[in-house]
Design a protein with these regions (language model features):
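Short catalytic micro-motifs in class I SAM-dependent methyltransferases
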Residues: 108-112
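A conserved beta-strand element that flanks and buttresses the S-adenosyl-L-methionine
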Residues: 105
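Class I (Rossmann-like) S-adenosyl-L-methionine-dependent methyltransferase catalytic domain
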Residues: 1-99, 113-193
Length: 193
């Protein structure tokens, strides 16, 4: 299966989005609710239908930027959130994106890219995170699939990979995952020191 812009757009066009839970995940919701600085610049790569961005915007975070290959996913988001600034919706390649962000949210993007791209993902994250910026989100702690998304993995493989690029890496079992993902997710907090 070739993972291309056309494939992802087609999946959104056909509503073939089995990973989409239809709302923000509980671990991220609770994390966002404790954030105090509403002026931080946030990026959500591989944002899909972007329920996280919708929730952040409702909380008063106005510098939320979304990037996805699939224009249909961004269109879905814009339809639900017509007041969200169009200039902060980017249809493009995460690996070519430029900018600096205080917070980057990981929610099913890492598992959607081929495992061969994981090191490239971390190099790009390092470039996009401002000094003391954070990468926060969820990773599957489950084997899942090796030939198609969602590509899985285990904490034992993630830690050395993430630690190669970041010296502040925390990965803990998510205690508040939705039932279908219980005991299968890691909540990650990575700081760009």
């Amino acid at each position: 299966m070739k993972l291309s812009k056309d494939l992802w757009n087609e999946r959104y066009e056909n509503q073939d989005t089995g990973w989409d839970i239809g709302h923000i995940s509980t671990p991220l919701k609770e994390y966002f609710e404790q954030l105090e600085n509403k002026n931080i610049k946030i990026l959500i790569p591989g944002c899909g239908n972007a329920y996280e961005a919708e929730y952040l915007y409702e909380l008063g975070f106005k510098q939320v930027h979304l990037i996805d290959w699939a224009q249909k996913a961004l269109d879905n988001f814009q339809k639900r959130n017509p007041k969200f600034p169009k200039s902060q919706l980017i249809c493009g390649d995460f690996f070519k994106h430029q900018g600096q962000y205080e917070l980057i949210i990981e929610q099913t993007f890492f598992c959607a890219i081929h495992p061969d791209l994981r090191e490239k993902y971390l190099i790009q994250m390092k470039k996009l995170l401002a000094k003391n910026g954070k990468l926060v989100g969820l990773l599957f702690n489950d084997k899942l699939y090796s030939n198609r998304p969602p590509f899985g993995g285990k904490k034992s493989a993630y830690m050395p990979l993430f630690s190669k690029y970041f010296n502040q890496v925390s990965m803990e079992k998510a205690y508040n995952s939705i039932p279908s993902r219980a005991d299968r997710e890691l909540f990650i907090r990575i700081e760009n020191k």
